[in-house]
């Protein structure tokens, strides 16, 4: 691995409907095989369903759902003298957002509703109300960090 240059982060263009960078990143994560228009229709469709069901601003609800799923701490493996410890570390803002997006999408894909629009909208509503698999994933991560608090002095 070359240490000469830092990897340059690509600029994400805000989405067309809301003009929001987070929605755009979410869309890019949903996208498979470069099919952006399909991802767009899924995300916008899900946000329309959310708006109809919750009768509130879908963007606010989306941001709330992301905040409820984003982890504050996680565990990272650290090898010390032949033993591997799970060391709890704080999560950087960028990674918090990335993990929240990843977990929301994974939880939505694992649901049983018929279409992805239905699955995603249901998961977003659940996450906004602190329920669902994505929130459970965050709770598990926090529980893991809490259980390994004794090793927090190994932080780097």
UniProtKB/Swiss-Prot annotation:
Keyword Ion transport attached: no
Protein name listed in UniProt: Small ribosomal subunit protein uS7
Gene Ontology process terms (BP): translation
Biological role: One of the primary rRNA binding proteins, it binds directly to 16S rRNA where it nucleates assembly of the head domain of the 30S subunit. Is located at the subunit interface close to the decoding center, probably blocks exit of the E-site tRNA.
Keywords on record: Ribonucleoprotein, Ribosomal protein, RNA-binding, rRNA-binding, tRNA-binding
NCBIfam families: rpsG_bact (TIGR01029)
Subunit structure comment from the entry: Part of the 30S ribosomal subunit. Contacts proteins S9 and S11.
InterPro entries per record: Ribosomal_uS7 (IPR000235), Ribosomal_uS7_bac/org-type (IPR005717), Ribosomal_uS7_CS (IPR020606), Ribosomal_uS7_dom (IPR023798), Ribosomal_uS7_dom_sf (IPR036823)
Domain of life: Bacteria
Organism: Azorhizobium caulinodans (strain ATCC 43989 / DSM 5975 / JCM 20966 / LMG 6465 / NBRC 14845 / NCIMB 13405 / ORS 571)
Cellular-component GO terms for this entry: small ribosomal subunit
Gene3D superfamilies registered for this protein in UniProt: Ribosomal protein S7 domain (1.10.455.10)
GO molecular function: rRNA binding; structural constituent of ribosome; tRNA binding
UniProt KW RNA-binding keyword: yes
Recorded family membership: Belongs to the universal ribosomal protein uS7 family.
